Amino acid sequence: MFEVKLKDGSAKEFDGEISLLDVCKSISEGLARDCVGAVVDGKIMGLMETIDSDCEVQFVKFDDDEGKQVFWHTSSHLMAYAIQRLYPGTKFAIGPSIDSGFYYDLDTDHKFVPEDLEKIEAEMKKIVKENPKLVRVEISRKEALERFKNEGQDYKVDLIENFDEDATITLYEMGDFVDLCRGPHLLDVKNIKAFKLLSIAGAYWRGDENNKMLQRIYGISFPKKKLLDEYLDRMEEAKKRDHRKIGKEMGLFSIQEEGPGFPFFHPNGMVVLNELEKFLKEQLLERGYGQIKTPLILNEHLWHQSGHWDHYKENMYFTKIDGEDYAIKPMNCPGSILVYKDELHSYRELPIKVAELGQVHRHELSGALHGLFRVRTFVQDDAHVFCLPEQIEEEVSKTIDFCDYIYSKFGFKYEVELSTRPEDSMGSDEDWDLAISSLKNALEHKGLPYKINEGDGAFYGPKIDFHLEDAIGRTWQCGTIQLDFQMPERFDMTYIASDGSKKRPAMIHRAILGSEERFMGILIEHYAGKFPLWLSPVQVEILPISDKFNDYAYELQQKMKARGLRVKVDDRSEKIGLKIRESQLKKVNYSLIIGQNEIDNNEVSVRKRDIGDVGSKNTDEFINELVDEYQNRK
């Protein structure tokens, strides 16, 4: 007899081994129809799997994140089965679920083109009608190697060879398709009612550019067609908002062949970045941070001491100076630590808060680069708080408030995630337990709901991550608050305690925007290029109705520039209707039409972006309104 505790606090007892499906049915047949999997003691499992001892079980539906993982993982196998039928001899690499759907990496002589995706979808529909059951099979490593060698599945063999000799290997069968897979999966495919194969890309085996380039097919699936239609509508809207397209149209930035992954910011783009930094610097000053600047290149021994050499070397760039090895910094924290250590500190000074808008470089594979979202160099809005252990919770709470203030200025809602200890970590169990409980306490005292993301913390400590929701419902991980007891130990950081002894400070790493470049890309898509006045590269465009009013238009421009506004004049000999339309296409916040009537009455005829004609206004009063809107970041 064993006990199963359920999410609602109730419990059920069972005599012997039982499938999760049968546990679900014992609660409700309706629940069993809707469920796609279960979380058992924190681990996602398929309904076909069994339990035989005391545990906590939460059944999940497609709407749950864990449910989507199961649904999309099975959809990946469904696609692979269709490909096996259509293109015999295909070698299958890996096919996981991802944040938005699934993919499978494939090795085949057939070069996939977009037209093939429709053919594969049609075959997937046939398989769904056949509704083959998924069967979970456990075999020995030796049997698995023999099976996949005989089938010529070299990539599966490569994966299996990395398992221990005595490992039990899990396979999943779907009709004639058999895959090496830990699961979990759906019971069958009948509920995969709507799907779309989205794109074809290239991917190196194991992400190593020295290995063979494979073909990757991405897809998405849902239990209802309505959900697929809504998703495709959002995708279409996302295409219109693509920051690479808008960035080019608005003259914000470019990526040149001479520097893949290294963005070039144009004058309009620098306006946006400068306004972002100005906003941040004002808030840093108000909240008691000092600003620092540390070198881009630092001696290799620093990165050994910090642990980055052991945990991050593959993402770093290196150089030699005077015969010694140096690294281009991938993170700002070691520099901040050296600044702290340059002076002796008393407990009375703590907390000490230092911020750096520091440029970092991180190696990314060329195939992973994507506009401003994935680059090789970026400015990180880092700050480090050195404090007493008893100050941790208060300082984390203040940092949460700081993040909330910044995000609300852009209209972002957000969700919070607490990431715990990864396998590749530094430090004792006691340090990690204290760090995690400190972050939990801060979140709970703020009343913020949060999810636990097991094993996704930094190698030196747990972290709180902020996931922002943009205007079309996509989420972006931006801000992070990380607690670190390891760096103070490694760098022998101290302060003088009240009793005169030397003690270790706690260290909080935090970033709010994260990468400035990535955050700018998010803002471009969030606003679809229609920035609020304070961020707009061109806030006002003056449109004289004929050439004879150009001189007055330039006088007005100078008057507005003197008040700090960004203003352009369209002095072309074109019809005013054309000028208005083109001004709207340029996403200018305000277009001012100037003619004799406006000059005689000291007025401007105002058109506001997305609203249109808002009538005539007194010129001086309108300028005052704009200055107020700009300075107060409305």
From Swiss-Prot:
Residues where Zn(2+) binds: C333, H384, H509
Pfam families: HGTP_anticodon (PF03129), TGS (PF02824), tRNA-synt_2b (PF00587), tRNA_SAD (PF07973)
PROSITE patterns hit by this protein: AA_TRNA_LIGASE_II (PS50862), TGS (PS51880)
One GO cellular component term noted in the UniProt record for this chain: cytoplasm
Cross-referenced CDD domains: TGS_ThrRS, ThrRS_anticodon, ThrRS_core
Subcellular location: Cytoplasm
EC number per UniProt: 6.1.1.3
Any one GO MF annotation of this record: transferase activity
Catalysis: reaction(s): tRNA(Thr) + L-threonine + ATP = L-threonyl-tRNA(Thr) + AMP + diphosphate + H(+)
Cofactor(s) the protein needs: Zn(2+)
TGS domain sequence ranges: 1-61
Record key words, sorted: Aminoacyl-tRNA synthetase, ATP-binding, Cytoplasm, Ligase, Metal-binding, Nucleotide-binding, Protein biosynthesis, RNA-binding, tRNA-binding, Zinc
Cofactor binding: number and manner: Binds 1 zinc ion per subunit.
Region (Catalytic): 242-532
Domain of life: Bacteria
GO biological process: threonyl-tRNA aminoacylation
Primary localization class, coarse: cytoplasm
Function per UniProt: Catalyzes the attachment of threonine to tRNA(Thr) in a two-step reaction: L-threonine is first activated by ATP to form Thr-AMP and then transferred to the acceptor end of tRNA(Thr). Also edits incorrectly charged L-seryl-tRNA(Thr).
Binding partners and assembly: Homodimer.
Name of the molecule in the record: Threonine--tRNA ligase
Organism: Finegoldia magna (strain ATCC 29328 / DSM 20472 / WAL 2508) (Peptostreptococcus magnus)
Gene responsible for this protein: thrS
